[in-house]
Design a protein with these regions (language model features):
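Outer membrane beta-barrel strand-and-loop segments of large Gram-negative receptors
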Residues: 8, 116, 120, 126, ...
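Gram-negative outer-membrane beta-barrel transporters
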Residues: 146-149, 166-259
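Residue-level signature of outer-membrane beta-barrel architecture
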Residues: 22, 26-28, 32, 73-77, ...
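Outer-membrane beta-barrel translocator domains and adjoining extracellular loop/strand segments
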Residues: 46-54, 96-102, 109-110, 153-161, ...
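Transmembrane beta-strands of outer-membrane beta-barrel pores
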Residues: 40-46, 87-93, 100-102, 133, ...
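C-terminal beta-signal and adjacent terminal beta-strands/loops
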Residues: 151, 251-263, 286-346
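Signature of Gram-negative outer-membrane beta-barrel scaffolds
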Residues: 1-78, 104
Length: 346
C-alpha cells in the first residue's frame, strides 16, 4: 500500500501475516461434544514515513507472535435442548492510518485526525455460556451470558487544537464487558400467517475501563460499546411464487464515540463525545421470474432519524452542588437509500 502527496502526509507500509491452526473434535457419548484448537499467528507491520511536520523520518517494524486458544463444549440435554460453553482469545490490530503519524482532515467531523505510532495490539479473552432450544424446524430460542476482558483496548480520543478538534487513537490499560443476550426465531404459521417468521436479538451489556491508580480518568464505559442493542425483523418467504421480503428494525444505546481529556478539576474536563440512540428501519423485496431473472428492491434507513453526537458536561459549583449540561457537537440525517436491481443467471 502506498499513499503520497507531501512528506508530512505520505508513507509506505506493508504487513505480513502467517498463521497455522491445530484443532480436534472430541465426542463423549452421544450428548457431550468438544471442539478445541489453537491458532498461531506471526504478524509484522512495517511503515516508513515522516513526522506530522514532514521533517523527521519515522520507521516502524512491529513484530508479534501470538497463540489464540479456543474451546467450545456442547451438551445435548435432549433432541431440542442444548447447553453450550465457549472460550476464545482474539486480537484487534491497529489499521495503517491509526499508526502513521501524519495528519489528515475529516470533512464530516470538520476536524483533523492523526495516527499514533505507539499504538499496540489489543487482545480480548471471551467467555460465553448459552442455552439453546429448538422447538420446531427453523425455529430457535437461545439465552446466553458472556464476559470479555480486554488488554490494551484501542479507543479513539480527541483534544482541542487551536480553533478546532484533533482526533487520534490510544490504548487504554484494561477493560471488561459482561452481559446477557437473547436470540429468537419463530414461525407465525400457528396464527395463519404462513411463510412469515419473526426474528429478534437483544442484549444488555455492561462495560468498564480500568485505569492506572492515581490517574485523572474516572469510571466510564468502553468507547464504542452500547449498553444495549435491539434487532428485530419480519421475514416472508413464498418459494412457489419466488417471493421473499423482510422488514428489519435496529436500535443501539448511547455509546462513547471519542474519549475526551479528564483533568484533576472536573470543571476543566474535555468531556467524552457520545453517539446518541437512534432507530433504523430497512425494507427489502425480491421476486424470481423463471429460473434466470430476479428483481430486487430495497429501502435502507426508512425513518431517516438524526445521527446525533453530544457531550454531557459535569460541573461542580462553589457550594459543592453538581449539575450536568448537555450540548450538541454535531448532527445530520443520513438520508434514505432506495435501490432497485435485476440479476440474471446464465
Amino acid at each position: 500500500m502506498r499513499e503520497t502527496t507531501t512528506n508530512s502526509d505520505s508513507y509506505t507500509s506493508e504487513n505480513i501475516l502467517g498463521a497455522a491452526y491445530v484443532s480436534a473434535k472430541l465426542n463423549y457419548g452421544e450428548a457431550l461434544n468438544a471442539n478445541i484448537g489453537v491458532r498461531m499467528e506471526y504478524y509484522n507491520l512495517k511503515m516508513d514515513g515522516y513526522s506530522s511536520d514532514g521533517t523527521t523520518p519515522v520507521h516502524l517494524d512491529n513484530r508479534t507472535s501470538d497463540f489464540f486458544p479456543s474451546v467450545n463444549i456442547s451438551y445435548n440435554l435432549s433432541a431440542k435442548h442444548l447447553v453450550r460453553a465457549a472460550y476464545g482469545r482474539s486480537v484487534n490490530r491497529p489499521e495503517f492510518r491509526e499508526v502513521v503519524p501524519y495528519v489528515y482532515f475529516n470533512f464530516e467531523r470538520d476536524a483533523n485526525i492523526v495516527g499514533n505510532t505507539e499504538l499496540k495490539n489489543a487482545y480480548a479473552d471471551n467467555l460465553e455460556v448459552r442455552y439453546e432450544f429448538y422447538p420446531a424446524s427453523g425455529e430457535m430460542i437461545t439465552i446466553g451470558a458472556f464476559y470479555k476482558r480486554f488488554k490494551d483496548p484501542i479507543e479513539e480520543t480527541y483534544n482541542e487544537a487551536g480553533s478546532g478538534l484533533q482526533y487520534t487513537y490510544h490504548n487504554a490499560k484494561n477493560a471488561e464487558t459482561f452481559g446477557i443476550e437473547l436470540d429468537m426465531k419463530k414461525s407465525l404459521d400457528f396464527i395463519g400467517l404462513r411463510g412469515l417468521s419473526l426474528v429478534c436479538n437483544a442484549a444488555y451489556i455492561h462495560s468498564r475501563v480500568r485505569f492506572e491508580e492515581g490517574a485523572p480518568e474516572r469510571d466510564r464505559p468502553l468507547a464504542g460499546q452500547s449498553p444495549y442493542l435491539v434487532n428485530a425483523g419480519l421475514f416472508y418467504q413464498h418459494d412457489d411464487k419466488g417471493i421473499s421480503a423482510s422488514l428489519l428494525y435496529n436500535r443501539i444505546g448511547k455509546r462513547i464515540e471519542s474519549v475526551g481529556v479528564p483533568m484533576q478539576d472536573q470543571n476543566e474536563d474535555i468531556p467524552d463525545i457520545y453517539e446518541m440512540p437512534r432507530n433504523s428501519l430497512d425494507l427489502t423485496f425480491s421476486k424470481k421470474i423463471g429460473k434466470a431473472v430476479e428483481i430486487k428492491a430495497g429501502i435502507q434507513d426508512m425513518l431517516n432519524s438524526k445521527i446525533e453526537y453530544k457531550q454531557f458536561v459535569k460541573l461542580t459549583d462553589k457550594n459543592g452542588g453538581k449539575r450536568e449540561r448537555e450540548q450538541l457537537v454535531r448532527s445530520y440525517r443520513p438520508g434514505v437509500d432506495i435501490n432497485v436491481g435485476v440479476s440474471l443467471k446464465f
